[in-house]
Every structure is written in C-alpha cells, then in structure tokens.
Amino acid sequence: MINIDYIMDLLDWNNSIEKQAEGIKLARNVKSINVFLQPCDKCHNKNVWDNCAKVLCEKADDELSPYLVELLEWLQDLNWPGAFRILDRLKSFQGGSAYNIAFNTCLRLAQALKDDVWESNLCMIGGEL
C-alpha cells in the first residue's frame, strides 16, 4: 500500500509532468476520495488542488454523490486551482435528488453569506430551488 502523503507529494504542481502523472495514476486507486477534496495542510494545499480535481473528475456520479456539497463549495472562487474542472464535471452530474439537495444547500448558504460570486458560480451549473 502506498502512503497518501507520497501520492500527494507527487501531485504537487511544482513537480515534473511525469511525476504529476504518476501521482494521478496512483491516486486513481485510492478508495477514500475525500482526501482529494481541497486538502489544506502545511505541504498539500492549493499546490495539489488541480491534480486532485483531475482525479475527482474521473470518478463516477455514485462515487462523487456523498461529496457534492464539498464539490460545490469548490466553486466559491473560480480562481482556485481545479475549480473549472469541478464546474465542468458537475455540469454532467446525473444525481437527481442528491444533487438538488446539495445544490440547494450551497445556494442557500451562499445567499445567507451574501456571497454573490459563489451564488453566480453555482448558477452556471444550475439546479432546482
């Protein structure tokens, strides 16, 4: 079994394309995909987000469904690495009620926080109110 920190180290955008590709290849086999949801620690933060988004975007809808709120939260700022990848993946999500619940939760949160940017970004993918 390969250590998740080793995989995250490979996903760092400061690495060569080859090392990043190896990290993505290894990350595909990680069962607990929550580790790729915008990690924020001393060594692994925005420097791995784009590659984490690549890994997440390859996952099936049923694998992503438990993490829809976190994926929608990634859209708070489209300047964040990986945000456009997540946006495009969510546009193709076929989750029905699970998606609508997560979307409405995040939309209401954005409205409560008066976060017009996030609200606008959420509207790019649409959902039900």
Locate each region found by the language model.
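Structural detector for internal amphipathic alpha-helices that build alpha-solenoid repeat scaffolds
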Residues: 18-29, 49-62, 73-77, 81-93, ...
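Alpha-helical scaffold segments
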Residues: 2-6, 15, 33-45, 51, ...
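N-terminal "cap/leader" segments of large eukaryotic alpha-helical scaffolds
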Residues: 1-25
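Amphipathic alpha-helical scaffolding segments comprising HEAT/armadillo-like alpha-solenoid repeats
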Residues: 1-10, 30-41, 61-74, 96-108
